[in-house]
UniProtKB/Swiss-Prot annotation:
InterPro entries: DUF3314
Family the UniProt entry places it in: Belongs to the UPF0575 family.
Pro residues biased stretches: 17-32, 70-80
Protein name as annotated: UPF0575 protein C19orf67
Region (Disordered): 1-84
Amino acid sequence: MATEQWFEGSLPLDPGETPPPDALEPGTPPCGDPSRSTPPGRPGNPSEPDPEDAEGRLAEARASTSSPKPLVPRPGPAPPRLSLDTLFSPITQQLRYLLKKADDFQSYLLYSRDQVQKEQLAKAMPTFLQMCEPYFLYLEAAARSIPPIYGPLQELVRKGLLEISQQLTLRLEQLVLMYASFGFVDLEEMNPLSISCFFCGRFSISLSHEVSIFRYCAPTAYTASRFPRYLYKKMRWHLEATPEAPGRGQDSLVDYYFLCYRDTWEDTGQSPANSCPQIQKLWSIGRWVPLGPAEDDLYSWILCPQPLGDYQQLLTIGFEEPTPTLATDLLVQILTGQAGQARPPSAAGPAGWAAQGS
């Protein structure tokens, strides 16, 4: 029948139309392109990938595995950086504790009627000053020692620590002077039981040199014999040099430096009675120059009430008293400026010591 013949053949396809899979003959490409025909002797399988595509993918896989890129670890979270307030919190707490103790000493002195208690507190004053020494040690060493220990924050930390050190220094000086004004404390330097000065810290300026700081509670004559005349000291520094080869019977060598002032009417030749009512004080930093007795004469040292020495002025500051922090800063500049220069014959230590710390 005609109808049966019409259904026996396949329907004509429109241009670009793909026949269904079951209507394709073996070896016939889907798009009818003769260039993409199946090679002879190999049955066509529409589910297999094209050889050219497979080779391209294989080449890409080889390229990706032949030169693998190194794995770069992602930067982890930065460690938390302490703020200055957090860093200074335990330091300021200790400062408040020591200032509170100083206020207690002052309150008992001013408001207590118990004379025995006041005398006992005066005897406890040296112990209280010694209790402050470890705190001073930390403040000055952390602020000034070389190399710095706080990295980029060193300058900010240095300023804060030195302000705290100066605040406590002036408070202790005021407290000792107040007890001395009531007659409970002696400021005479010749008295071994007096509190003429107290320790304010220590720091290193090189690998073999350390500086210790002392503050006089009141201006004190430079020597007991009052020579040089009209010269009074307010601060003292010990420059201790450790020998390069310790353990061979060599002791540390110590130089002494002072913050002093000199009454200016001495230069005019006038006596204090004929001078102006307001006497100006010319401040300077100098070094102790020993005059005697000889270092190897032990008998002379025993009979000598006080060593003789002169004052070698190294820096003239002016008529305004420097703060304790500024005075120590100026001394450090003087000491570090001596690098590579010959020291005076009476000075201890090798020349050019500051270069050792560089």
